[in-house]
From Swiss-Prot:
Binding annotation for Mg(2+): 535, 537, 539
Disulphide linkage map: none
Binding annotation for Zn(2+) 2: 902, 984, 991, 994
Protein name: DNA-directed RNA polymerase subunit beta'
EC number: 2.7.7.6
């Protein structure tokens, strides 16, 4: 077997018959498989041991040679080589065909490669191949020309003979008629009898003339056909072809079936054909030029690759190894076999029958029919169902052909090469493990024992519990007590990986240190749930064991849960307290008044009656007061604190030099808040406020912001420890808080009826206007009722909110952000409001009752529509989202950080600061742009950034940290030019500077990071949260696609529904009203020709524009585009989305990049999902990587082909250097599916979609896969060239330090090492920069 690490590229080409014979170990001659009595393979059959190798290791078929000592001997009795039975997985056979057959991929694929090569229409080709027509393969023009006069004379002579025969026949018949008439007259027959005889004779003579004319016409047709006969001419009429063969067979050759095609291919001159086609392309136009271009692609492919086109017609076919198409015996003595065996059997049967017929000299028609059947059986073997009805097996099931084995989710690529199952893995249900640390998981004892079995057995032998491995194995299987102690040792510091399907992003698989637990369920840390999207309602997780030291190191350093706190999509923390923990922390940090429970002992200033209350000298004293029951947890008190850092404002005021541990300050706080701050690192500024997960507001602190801040300023280990403390405190105080939900906590609004009566009256008025007065259209009635009842729901909801006291558990849960939202409380206690029907339109009767009161039957029925639609949508969305992720991964999988800096000066401009104006419109300061988090953060400056005075604030190439961005905002810098993957000049992949920082680590991205995969996961993972809805815009503009379908539409670069045309020039608008349409004319500002847009739909509506108010020119208003308005280049003229192809044409590459980023982000932001722009930019870079060649210049490119822009750049540079003409290209935007299939790697494209088409194309072009991306390396089993598998890390050998060497080579009885140091290099233990240490 070839070792995958010893080759760098993989090439695919066309196999000739000689190649197939060379691979083969023998010819399969019989259709038999195995003997059903002896169960041994039949000789020369499909499982023959002589051809494919022995079925048992080191044993020949007849049993003469057994054991390994006869290795390599070929038995003289049975002819079987003594070797391992594994060779039956790799040895091939072949079938010698009695007649050639065409390969269905090349004849039936779209486009038909055979058809393009030979310039034959696929229909004609099919007629020839399946023996329905003859084709002329060659004509001897010289001989024909030389003998033409003689042949013509012969033909004219034959014509004269025919005419002479006709004349004599007619004369004979006329003479006979005379006799007959004479006889009749003599007999005294009547006139009508004579006429009858006369007519019959005339009719006969007419027939004779017609027959002769037909004969002459046929002779003329045969002669004309012969004179004009040319190669590749098809003759459908069998009789004409036979006549031609009879008369002129010396002057031409022809035939039918694959044999004729083979002859044509052998006579085909690639070079002269390519020359002719290039001539047509240069001088021709229209359809002719297009056809020539398409044909040249195929001809040039054969020319360039050196493939022999004759490989498309097969003289022999390969038989794949028998272990890959096995036959197994079932219980009842029957056999289950792979479909391939049936298909091979059909081929062999028909082939043998054809051989026999040819030997017997059967009539041609029978032989041709048998040849056609052989062709069909080979077609079915290669690709069943591609042509005609598929061959079916038992139960009318189409048999799986060789093509079907590769295709689809169950095919070889996706099932066995990209998705292997692995050993050392298990799965079980998960339960919560609140006692665990963030980097730990609970592993059931039995599962751990099975997973770590080899490690345990090794240790048992090492520790002398067992004499050998066999007895150690027995001990493990019997679960002896000592095994458990050894297991504890084996699992310590050996991380395991947990995975929850679906693994939508890289945090769906993380490493943990196992802790042994009783029971059979895996225990998961509560904070890890968010990343896995796990809950404990029966979810299962898989456990995988990293075996090698390198794998363990990677799991511990890169994948440990405590090192993966931040989301790779947005850089926000994913491991955050949720649910109970949030409730607990909210309860702990609340503040209450003296008269509320938990508020006793609050601060009261000193009065004449007594000293101040609620003042404590230390945190310890406050704790003591609580233990005595005089101080509530949430009471506001004053405490002297010296062990925690003061809040920022107090520190600035009281400790201008900076605060040191031990410096005393006075906190105005609650005991609970001190307890919370105790959880944070001691030098983190004190937080005074109530902790919430979402919602924010005055006096509230977002937990996410705190963790973000911690992650940015402290090492990961500190962050992980802090979060564990938060988790413990959250659970502890959630338990103590007694927050529960019961029916009595749901308070019902007393005055709901009054509110609803008011709205009911309004609704009646609207209904009356529609039904009785006809003053409203159906649409207006609908819109008004929807609006009315939405207002009603809001009013009832807001009233309900005011009804609840702060200490009611329901608002506590909602306000803390632990679960639910206010809308759900409205539904529980107020009213459900409007619901949708199954089409997604609102039902105009609202649900007026709350769930607490209970719904009426009609309300329940109305509500069930929407609920079911919701569930159906969710299911569809999950599937669609998964497919989108798969396409995104495929298009971006080879985008890896390849180098540190590509050295480009280019970049994109992103907004930073926005002016803050007062009522008069004066600028009072600056604030950060709303999109700063997802556009500027984590980038590298492309050029120097200067403030208003011209001082350089940021140097080119400097990272834009949060601190720098704050400084830029303060200085009022409105936009900066940053490096972006869109402008990166690295040919394959991207450079670290253009990518910026990795969102998951907060540091500049490492070389080798698979940023393309991260980008695809970051976009695909939130896909399930996006809606499936199509929004209805009240009558105008039709439906607006939103949510997931919109994202797909953008990434596939489809023309959107109701697309809006865009202005190609800047100028003034002139509108003409033409019934249902507008005609819009733009008068350009530069005075060039006017641009006219016709047939603009009124129904779609004109676009909205922002214009200054007449009364207050400082303010802007939105209104519909009108006569005399000014439009800029790229402005939309109608409502609806713009077509990306139009945007590319009008605004160029940068314009379409910006358009796509903005549009995709709009969809995600609408759902509250934060994704950094750089992820979307990576996908867009892949969509815009190629261009169409318009003029090829002096390059090798063909006009009309898609080429990689970096490839074209290199080719143009070479052409210019040699004094030639560069190629002209037009930028193209390709959808992600098309871009994936156009990738350089044929392995990656074939495993994605349209497997057979990709492989057909790759084989003709003899494509070579350079194994640059991840997918192709996974398929062939190499380490992926990303992360730690990148080449610069591959050749590193680790050298021990002095201390380590002494420890390794010391002998206990002697003090010193007996090895001298001169045998070693200098090991100082210092790390060596990789690039200097090795020439990489």
């Amino acid at each position: 077997m070839i070792d995958v690490n010893f080759f760098d590229e993989l090439r695919i080409g066309l196999a000739t018959a000689d190649d197939i014979r060379r691979w083969s170990k023998g010819e399969v001659k019989k259709p038999e498989t195995i003997n059903y009595r002896t169960l041994k393979p039949e000789k020369d059959g499909l499982f023959c041991e002589r051809i494919f190798g022995p079925t048992r290791d080191w044993e020949c078929a007849c049993g003469k040679y057994k054991r390994v000592r006869y290795k390599g001997i070929i038995c003289e009795r049975c002819g079987v080589e003594v070797t391992k039975s594994k060779v039956r997985r790799e040895r091939m056979g072949h079938i010698e065909l009695a007649a050639p057959v065409t390969h269905i991929w090349y004849f039936k694929g779209v486009p038909s490669r055979l058809g393009y090569l030979l310039d034959l229409a696929p229909k004609d080709l099919e007629r020839i191949i399946y023996f329905a027509a003859n084709i002329i393969t060659s004509v001897d023009d010289e001989a024909r020309h030389a003998d033409q006069t003689t042949l013509e004379a012969e033909m004219l002579l034959e014509k004269k003979d025919v005419e002479a025969d006709m004349e004599s026949e007619i004369a004979e018949r006329a003479a006979k008629l005379e006799e007959d008439l004479a006889e009749l007259e003599a007999a005294g027959a009547k006139a009508d009898a004579r006429n009858k005889v006369k007519k019959a004779a005339e009719k006969e003579m007419q027939h004779i003339r017609e027959r002769a004319e037909r004969e002459i016409d046929r002779l003329e047709e045969i002669w004309q056909t012969f004179i004009k006969l040319a190669p590749k001419q098809m003759i459908i009429d069998e009789t004409i072809y036979e006549e031609l063969v009879d008369r002129y067979e010396d002057y031409f050759t022809g035939g039918m079936g694959a044999e004729a095609i083979q002859t044509l291919i052998r006579n085909f001159d690639l070079d002269s054909e390519a020359e002719e086609l290039r001539e047509i392309i240069n001088n021709g136009k229209g359809q002719k030029k297009m056809r020539a271009l398409k044909r040249l692609k195929v001809v040039a492919a054969f020319q360039r690759s050196g493939n022999d086109p004759a490989g498309m017609v097969l003289d022999c076919i390969p038989v794949i190894p028998p272990e890959l198409r096995p036959m197994v015996q079932l219980d009842g003595g029957r056999f289950a076999t792979s479909d391939l065996n049936d298909l091979y059997r059909r081929v062999i049967n028909r082939n043998n029958r054809l051989k026999r017929m040819i030997e017997l000299g059967a009539p041609e028609i029978i032989v041709n029919n048998e040849k056609r059947m052989l062709q069909e059986s080979v077609d079915a073997l290669f690709d069943n169902g591609r042509r005609g009805r598929p061959v079916t097996g038992p139960g009318n099931r189409p048999l799986k052909s060789l093509s079907d084995l590769l295709k689809g989710k169950q095919g070889r690529f996706r099932q066995n090469l990209l998705g292997k199952r692995v050993d050392y893995s298990g799965r079980s249900v998960i339960i919560v493990g609140p006692q665990l640390k963030l980097h730990e998981c609970g592993l059931p004892k039995l599962m751990a024992l099975e997973l770590f079995k080899p490690f345990v057995m090794k240790r048992l032998v090492e520790n002398d519990y067992a004499q050998n491995i066999k007895s150690a194995k027995r001990m493990v299987e019997r679960q002896r007590p000592e095994v458990w102690d050894v297991l504890e040792e084996a699992i310590s510091e050996h991380p395991v990986m947990l995975n929850r399907a679906p693994t939508l992003h890289r945090l769906g698989i993380q490493a943990f240190e196992p802790k042994l637990v009783e029971g059979k369920a895996i225990q998961l840390h509560p904070l890890a749930c968010e990343a896995f999207n796990a809950d404990f309602d029966g979810d299962q997780m898989a456990v995988h064991l990293p075996l090698s030291a390198e794998a363990q190191a990677e799991a511990r350093i890169l994948m440990l849960a405590s090192n993966n706190i931040l989301s790779p999509a947005s850089g926000k923390p994913l491991a955050m307290p949720r649910l109970d923990m949030v409730t607990g922390l909210y309860y702990l940090t609340m503040d209450k008044n003296e008269n509320e429970i938990g508020g006793q002992g609050a601060y009261a200033s000193a009065t004449e009656e007594g000293p101040a209350q609620g003042v404590y000298s230390s945190y310890a004293e406050a704790i003591m007061a609580r233990d005595r029951g005089v101080l509530g947890l949430q009471a506001k008190i004053k405490v002297r604190i010296s062990h925690l850092r003061p809040p920022v404002d107090i520190e600035a005021e009281q400790f201008p030099e900076g605060w040191n541990k031990g410096d005393v300050w006075l906190a105005d706080t609650t005991l609970g808040r001190i307890m919370f701050n105790e959880l944070l690192p001691w030098n983190y500024p004190y937080l005074e406020g109530v902790m919430v997960r979402k919602g924010g507001g005055t006096g509230k602190i977002m937990l996410g912001d705190v963790i973000n801040d911690l992650a940015a300023t402290y090492p990961m280990i500190t962050v992980a420890q802090t979060m564990d403390k938060m988790k413990d405190a959250g659970f502890y105080w959630a338990t103590r808080s007694g927050v529960t939900i019961t029916m009595s906590d749901v308070l019902v609004l007393p005055n709901k009826e009054e509110i609803l009566d008011r709205y009911e009256a309004e609704a009646r008025k609207i209904e009356r206007k529609y039904w009785e007065q006809g003053a409203l259209t159906e649409r207006e009635r609908y819109d008004r009722l929807v609006e009315l009842w939405k207002d009603a729901t809001d009013e009832v909801g807001n009233a309900v909110e005011k009804l609840y006291p702060d200490d009611n558990p329901i608002p506590m849960i909602v306000k803390s952000g632990a679960a639910g939202n206010m809308r759900q409380i409205w539904t529980l206690a107020g009213m459900k409001g409007m619901v949708v029907n199954s089409k997604g339109d609102y039902i105009t009767r609202p649900i007026k009752t709350s769930f607490r009161e209970g719904l009426s039957v009609l309300e329940y029925f109305n509500n069930s529509h929407g609920s079911r639609k919701g569930l159906a949508d969710t299911a569809l969305r999950t599937a669609d989202s998964g497919y989108l992720t798969r396409r995104l991964v495929d298009v971006a999988q080879d985008v890896i950080v390849r180098e540190d800096d590509c050295g480009t000066k280019q970049g994109i401009r992103v907004p930073v600061a926005v002016e803050v104006k007062d009522a008069e419109g004066n600028v009072t300061g600056y604030t950060g742009h709303s999109l700063i988090e997802t556009s500027v953060a984590g980038r590298v400056a492309a050029t120097a950034v200067k403030d208003a005075e011209g001082n350089v604030m940021v140097e080119p190439g400097e990272n834009l940290t949060d601190q720098l961005i704050d400084e830029l905002i303060a200085a009022g810098v409105k936009e900066v030019k940053v490096r972006s993957v869109l402008t990166c000049q690295t040919p394959t992949g991207v450079c670290a500077k253009c990518y910026g920082k990795s969102m998951a680590t907060g540091k500049l991205v490492d070389i080798g990071e698979a940023v393309g995969i991260v980008a695809a996961q970051s976009i695909g993972e939130p896909g399930t949260q996006l809606t499936m809805r199509t929004f209805h815009q009240g009558g105008v503009g039709g439906d607006i696609t939103g949510g997931l379908p919109r994202v797909q539409e953008l990434f596939e670069a489809r023309v959107p529904k109701n697309r809006a045309p865009i202005a190609s020039v800047a100028g003034t608008v002139h509108l003409d009203d033409e019934g249902n349409f507008y005609t819009l004319t733009i008068n350009p500002d530069d005075g060039s020709d006017v641009v006219v847009y016709e047939k603009l739909s009124k129904r779609q509506g004109l676009a909205t524009v922002r214009v200054p108010m007449e009364s207050n020119p400082g303010a802007m208003i939105e209104r519909t585009l009108a006569e005399g308005d000014h439009v800029e280049v790229g402005d939309r003229l109608l409502r609806g989305p713009a077509d990306p192809h139009d945007v590319l044409e009008v605004l160029g590459r940068r314009g379409v990049e910006q358009h796509l980023v903005d549009e995709v982000q709009d969809v995600y932001r609408a759902q509250g999902v934060a994704i950094h722009d750089k992820h979307i930019e990576i996908i867009i870079r892949q969509m815009l990587r190629r261009g169409t060649v318009i003029e090829s210049g002096s390059t090798e490119f063909l006009p009309g082909t898609l080429v990689d822009l970096s490839e074209a750049k290199a080719a143009n540079a070479e052409a210019l250097a040699n004094g030639g003409q560069p190629a002209e290209l037009r930028s193209e935007i390709m959808g992600i599916t098309k871009a994936s299939l156009a990738t350089e790697s044929w392995l990656s494209a074939a495993s994605f979609q349209e497997t057979t088409r990709v492989l057909t194309d790759a084989a003709i072009n003899k494509r070579s896969d350079k194994l640059i991306g991840l997918k192709e390396n996974v398929i062939i089993g190499k380490l992926i060239p990303a992360g730690t598998g990148i080449s610069r890390y591959r050749n590193i050998s680790v050298k021990p330090t002095e201390a380590a060497r002494n420890a390794a080579y010391s002998i206990p009885t002697y003090g010193d090492s007996i090895y001298g140091d001169d045998g070693y290099g200098e090991f100082t233990g210092a790390s060596v920069p990789l690039d200097e240490a090795y020439d990489l």
